[in-house]
Amino acid sequence: MNEEQQKAVLSLNDTLLIAGAGSGKTHTIINKINYLIDTNIYKEKEILVISFTNESVNDIKRKCDREIDITTFHKLAINIIKDENYHLAGNTLDYIINEYFESYAKTNKKTNQIIKRICIETTISNLKTYIKTFINLYKANYSSIDTLWNLYNKSHFINKDYLKIILDIFLIYQRELESSGTHDFNDLIINAEKLISNNIKKVPYKFIIIDEFQDTSYTRLNLVLAIKKINNAKIFFVGDDYQSIYRFSGLDLNIFLNIKEYIPEITILKLVINYRNNQETINLANKFIMQNKKQIEKTVICQKNLNKPIKIVYFSNKQTIINKIIPDLFGTTLIMGRNNKDKYDYNIKETENLKFLTIHKSKGLEFDN
């Protein structure tokens, strides 16, 4: 381990480790777990590791041979409330959105006109996705229906049209959840936090490691802060503001950037050595990312150099790309696509060393190519 990684492993305070892609983040997490257990600072049952996706959780499990809890936020919340007669809503929101457009919107003249105005700029399919995204964002950050009404009343023109439809669907959705006695994933985490805060449920965790912390929401943060308060636990946040991609599901990068507002005495460390790329590629990527002035400026160092590292190659069709490039690669290879449809468009046949994942599902994983 390099000096920065050693500092991170040895830190016993609340810590934010800013770890860029290729900096040995997972290696550092595994070594920290081993250090905490081997030195008898914490017992295995007292350590909790949280990551964002099932894929990243499974990746850590494969690399960690300790009997500790490694889970997602949602599975943690389910474990906390499992005896509370709690029922998940499933695809209720998708169903309500589709029903709204297929029945009510077609028969209600005013709503139909609103949709036609909006769809000058987008499609019905995209509009449905925007609405689902908005509601998830809204609920994940504790916003109330009154706030949404105020936003609607202050809006003008096309924004007001959007909000009218969102308000309709949001109200129907909340009523359906209440009448059926079900809850969505946002409610799941909120209620788990309440059970911990009110001392109704207890968990054994005294050291919490949160991977991909840049991808968090206020509801998730409050859940771990509740555990921290009740158990006097320490938290080891690991993340990189350059890699935040889950805004669509209610996540807020400001939590990462302003972590001292929530834990004033937190120690902030950085992993600045990149083992994956060359310096030229890193410099180009950083120049692009820093166009957003809200990002944390950091110097990333690499021992590799490569003249003109980026090449643009044009192919006549998608299948040619796979046939031309894949045979020349060694080790494990990941092909990333925008959605699952790309896997079939490219006719990708997965093997032990060749995997296809969407960009979102690949978050936090490591491959040779």
Residue ranges and their predicted role:
Residues 85-168:
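ATP-hydrolysis module of ASCE/P-loop NTPase motor domains
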Residues 355-369:
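A short beta-strand element within the Helicase C-terminal
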Residues 341-353:
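Conserved helicase motor "Helicase C" RecA-like lobe of SF1/SF2 P-loop NTPases
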Residues 218-311:
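Conserved RecA-like helicase ATPase core segment
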Residues 1-21, 175, 265-273, 294-337, ...:
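Inter-lobe coupling/hinge region of RecA-like P-loop helicase motors
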Residues 49, 70, 209, 237, ...:
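Conserved SAM-binding loop
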Residues 1-88:
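P-loop NTPase Walker
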Residues 1-18, 158-254, 273, 364:
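Conserved helicase NTPase motor core
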